[in-house]
Amino acid sequence: TNIHTAVLQKGRPVEEISQLTPQMLKDGSWEGKSFRKYNIGLPPPRITPGRKHPYKEFLDNVKYKFVAMGFEEMRGGLVENEFWNMDALYMPQFHPARDIHDVYYVKEPASSKEIEEPFRTRVSDAHYSGGDTGSRGWKYHFDIEKAKRLMLRSQGTAVSARTLAGNPKIPGKYFSIARCFRYEQVDATHAQDFFQIEGIVLGDDINFRTLLGLLELFALEIAKAKEIEFLPAYFPFTEPSVELHVKHPKLGWMELGGAGIFRPEVTIPL
């Protein structure tokens, strides 16, 4: 019937082209073709791109700031021996100061290779009698087997110790964003796995005032702090030592970091 014929004619499939290509323009094959109409009302396919973790983005920004201030990046392994993590920093093997760092020890292998000379002898002498540092030392016999015990790095200063022993440039400025591990009770301000920002400045014409100025710059540029204050502190490997505190608009005063001038017992043996 006429109705059936009309329905069949209307439903007959028509070839449509969805995309006009350069080749079609070149050979003229587009002429006489039917092109699919665009429906601008259709929603586009949803794209779910990957994004940086906010904390990773913050660490990248910190790295950028340090490089912009003329610092060179230091690197080190996640697994370290007690010698570079503590002994080289004049932390005695028996002292309560060492208990600050409740660490994770490596089960296998439990110990590192022999400690490199002359650092082994120099650090051992500094602990026993002060060596060439002018100090009286800690007056105990250094246990080299304890110094070789492997552990997960508990502080970023271990990276600085290895840098000092590696003939760094003087004057020079170095930094690291070191992943550290401690056997902590996890709470709002403590974690067992964290990143520690570390920096050292080497030179003949720098002093404690230079350090305070750099800490203030750090607080302003990286923490965007409006109010800062310095408080006296104690660290086994620096003297004098200082804590940097900043005022958070909601949390109030909080510690941003600790710093100090490396003791001769640290710098001279290295």
Q: At which residue positions do the language-model features occur?
A:
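TRNA-recognition modules of translation machinery and tRNA-sensing kinases, especially anticodon-binding
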Residues: 4-270
